[in-house]
Amino acid sequence: MSRNFELLQRLSQDQEMFDTGAGLSALSPPPVASPPRHWEREGKPLKLEMEEKQRDEIMKCVQHVFLMGKTEAPRTVVLTGIESGTGCTWICCRAAQILASQVKGPVCVVDANLRSPGLHQYFGVDNHYGLADALHGTEPIRDFVRPLGPENLWLLSCGSDATNSHSRLISDPMRLRLAELRQYFEYVLIDAPAMSLGIDGIALGRAAEGVVLVLKANASRREAARKAVQDLQTAGARILGAVLNQRTFPIPQAIYSKL
């Protein structure tokens, strides 16, 4: 029996911990209007500007996933690339920015790509304290997130204690941290490792309320996309759709269903 199959079985048995926040007290939303804390910046921040066409297309994706007035619209969503190099972190960063500009409640973007973290670089902040540290610690999640400006956008970076921490993405501490984030933020966007790198993306996809797959135009293979869809469906993850980067538009359901 393969290791991946055994892990999928484990994920199925542990679904209750994904779906509930048992034992967690309700938390008040963070003070969105408060000024951000001062964090030491590392290097020069990467540019966050988007071309008008890029912004319009990512806006369509955000509206489709979060803001279409669905009775059960997802609040916790994983974004994961089919393979490495699809630009998933770029898409996640900008989708979080746009979502925060469209809603009043707090939005948190989480760097769960412990193998190759990048969100902190896009936002121009350090990576000294974040998810990996939270998985090893007992402090409330509010001690690990940081505001990203006067807007209602917050970051849970990868953190400094990421060595060999990727295995904890399918651990009880990770499930409890996600349940805590759900209670603390209105929306949570999670930048996950690429599907081709192992079980992490599948585990996080099952933990969340939905998954958006990111493909790269003229690069992502159809076979890899089909396998990613099958793996997520086997794990019981809800696939919300896909985004084709470097053309950057949501793939219509009629096309996505043929993957």
Can you describe what each PLM-predicted range is?
Residues 1-259:
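P-loop NTP-binding module
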